[in-house]
Amino acid sequence: MFFEIALIGTTASGKTYIADTLAREFDAVVLSLDSLCVYKEINIASAKPSQDDLASIKYFGVNLLSVNEHFNVELFIREYQKAKEFALARNLPLIIVGGTGFYLKTMIDGLSEKTLESKSSLNNDEIYTLLLNIDPNYKIEKNDTYRLKKWLGIYEQTREIPSEFLKRTQKTGVLKDIEIYELAWDKEILKKRIQTRTKEMLDNGLLDEAKILFYKFDHKLKALNSIGLKECKEYLDGEISFKDLENLITIHTTQLAKRQRTFNKKFQSKALEFDKALATLRMKFSIEK
């Protein structure tokens, strides 16, 4: 029968493995909420499910765009609606999985009224300084050009404090009363998993993937400045050694995992130790079925 769960966790926590295993065993549909897996050309850097997995499991949210195409959370809302419609029509469970917690939170909390991105010539530092003075409660990374321009666009068009405008115009979310499970790892063990995965990605051709991407596309594109690719660019430009490349990807991925862990505290989730996660979720799926 149809039911839905969300499976969250940091990068390298094993979310995809758990989701794919359950999908095969219970014929479940999977919606990926990952900001890199949406791109057709990024396979290794995104830790995208294998071609075999994508062929044997009904996936949504993967291989939707080219690297030079822009997207926002509305893309995932549309993919969720498609995935749910597909699963409901066939009476199948739906697993929502991904490390980009912002997308899941927006799907639960709802979107705010649309505004246009600012066309201002102000740079990131200037917009960020303005933000700190006007709207210090609005949390944006200093290097997030897209969200900074969106923030400035709201301020220019409404003359309201953007965080208050977004709260006032927020619509109902598409996800209701969904059970959320978070894969939990000891920090040191997770760091070792990240080290291992980094080495595997390099062994599997990450540098070759990066070469092709930087040859075909503008290196300033946001997707090409993601962890794994931006370090490859530095290596290919002769700025760092191969040893530095591996170390920097590991360090930056570990820092990302820390930020993800902090963000995931916003959810009312049930913690699952990885070793026990499959057994727990198998039991749930068996009962629901």
Swiss-Prot record:
* Alphabetized UniProt keyword annotations: ATP-binding, Magnesium, Nucleotide-binding, Transferase, tRNA processing
Write down the required cofactor(s): Mg(2+)
EC top class, in one word? transferase
Superkingdom field? Bacteria
Q: Where does substrate bind?
A: 11-16
Give binding positions for ATP: 9-16
Q: A Gene Ontology MF term for this entry? A: tRNA dimethylallyltransferase activity
Q: Which reaction does it catalyse?
A: adenosine(37) in tRNA + dimethylallyl diphosphate = N(6)-dimethylallyladenosine(37) in tRNA + diphosphate
InterPro entries, per database record: Dimethylallyltransferase, IPT, P-loop_NTPase
- For this protein, the parts annotated as crossing the membrane are none
GO terms of biological process kind:
tRNA modification
Asked if the Swiss-Prot or TrEMBL record annotates the protein with the keyword Ion transport, the reply is: no
Q: Where is this region: Interaction with substrate tRNA?
A: 34-37
Q: Where is this site: Interaction with substrate tRNA?
A: 100
One protein family per Pfam: IPPT
Q: What is its EC number?
A: 2.5.1.75
The protein's matches in HAMAP family, at most eight in alphabetical order, are given as: IPP_trans (MF_00185)
Q: Which family does it belong to?
A: Belongs to the IPP transferase family.
Give a short account of what the protein does.
Catalyzes the transfer of a dimethylallyl group onto the adenine at position 37 in tRNAs that read codons beginning with uridine, leading to the formation of N6-(dimethylallyl)adenosine (i(6)A).
Quaternary structure (record): Monomer.
**UniProt xrefs under PANTHER family:** TRNA DIMETHYLALLYLTRANSFERASE (PTHR11088:SF60)
Name the record gives this protein: tRNA dimethylallyltransferase
Q: Whose protein is this, by species?
A: Campylobacter jejuni subsp. doylei (strain ATCC BAA-1458 / RM4099 / 269.97)
The organism's taxonomy opens as: Bacteria, Pseudomonadati, Campylobacterota, Epsilonproteobacteria, Campylobacterales
Whichever gene encodes this chain, its name is miaA
